[in-house]
Each structure stands twice: as C-alpha cells, then as structure tokens.
UniProtKB/Swiss-Prot annotation:
NCBIfam families the UniProt entry points to: recR
CDD domains documented for this protein: TOPRIM_recR
Known role: May play a role in DNA repair. It seems to be involved in an RecBC-independent recombinational process of DNA repair. It may act with RecF and RecO.
Disulfide links within the chain: none
Positions of C4-type zinc fingers: 57-72
Source organism of this protein record: Pseudomonas savastanoi pv. phaseolicola (strain 1448A / Race 6) (Pseudomonas syringae pv. phaseolicola (strain 1448A / Race 6))
Full protein name: Recombination protein RecR
Alphabetic keyword roster: DNA damage, DNA recombination, DNA repair, Metal-binding, Zinc, Zinc-finger
GO BP field: DNA recombination; DNA repair
Protein family according to the UniProt entry: Belongs to the RecR family.
SMART domains recorded: TOPRIM (SM00493)
Gene behind this protein: recR
Lineage of the organism: Bacteria, Pseudomonadati, Pseudomonadota, Gammaproteobacteria, Pseudomonadales
Keyword flag DNA repair: yes
InterPro entries from the UniProt entry: DNA_Rcmb_RecR (IPR000093), Rcmb_RecR (IPR023627), Rcmb_RecR_Znf (IPR015967), TOPRIM_dom (IPR006171), TOPRIM_RecR (IPR034137)
Amino acid sequence: MSFSPLIRQLIDAFRVLPGVGQKTAQRMALQLLERDRSGGSRLALALGQAMDGVGHCRSCRTLTEEELCPQCADPRRDDTLLCVVEGPTDVYAVEQTGYRGRYFVLKGHLSPLDGLGPEAIGIPQLMERISQQGTFTEVILATNPTVEGEATAHYIAQLLHEKGLVASRIAHGVPLGGELDLVDGGTLAHSFAGRKPIAL
C-alpha cells in the first residue's frame, strides 16, 4: 500500500522506537489518524515538552528536568556507595531494590565493533566523579550481564583496582543475556544482596 507523504513521515517517525517495525508503526500511525486524534495531539505535545525540557543530571547523568535528579539531590543517600549502570532505565530498576547509594550512568557499554570505546560511554567522567567525590568506598558495577556488559565491568574494575578502590559486581540472579530494566524487583534485590568483589 502506498501512503501519502505525511502519513509515510509519521510511520517513519514511529520506527525510531526500539522494537517498532514497519507493521507496528503503520498500525500506530493509522490508529492515531483514524481513531484517536486527541491522543495524537497529547502525544505530540508530551513528546515536544520532554525533548525540550529533559536533560541529564550534572552529577550522575540520568535523565531529569532539573540540574540534579531526585537521587543526587537527596542528602540522605549513602555517599560511600556508587552504582554504575548502562542507562537511565537501569537506575529505575535498581531503585526498586531499596538501594540507597549514589549512581553514575554510562552511555551504554563497551563495543569496539560499534566504535564505542571508554570515552564514548563516559568512563573518563566516571573516574573523574570518583576522584572528585572522594567518599566512595565501594563501586558496584551493575552493567547488564551480557558479553559487552561483562567486558565493561571488567575494564572499569581494572581502573578502580589501580586506584586501590573496591569494585563489586552484582550477583548473577539476573539472567545471563538479560536487561536490568526487564528484571523483577525481587530478583534484582537478590542479585544486589549477593554481589561479590571482582577478582583481578
């Protein structure tokens, strides 16, 4: 079926979302145009406001509308623990466990084949944050339990070891090859309780 230029543009816009293919994008676009124009208007408004108003926390780099996210602005958090995650969705997953320390959000994981080295994902900024803060006694590496996540954790652990800092890895109650934001809170809490130092 051939769509008009504006409908094609809307379909292509939906396809930028993860997991949305051609057919799903068509269904979404046609649903909004045929049956829910007010929903489409709300979506456009919310998307525009979020794109303009949401940035990154200057401390941990998660998504927020403020200079500091709620976790970084909270003075009751434990300043001796730093949890390193791959992305903002992982912060929300870890929060479900009752973790009360600080965070640092990488921009993904090391992936040399995709051209993502330490600088691209923010490892120099992580090391700078650790040096500047000076209060962390343990850095919890909560990268995803994938090959790339494990490589990223090992790389960071080596850097921390050179500075005499303790690095721990969340236990593997999280399924291998899984994503943190898809794991239930109980499993993730168990993984945190069973974390162990990384042997180098």
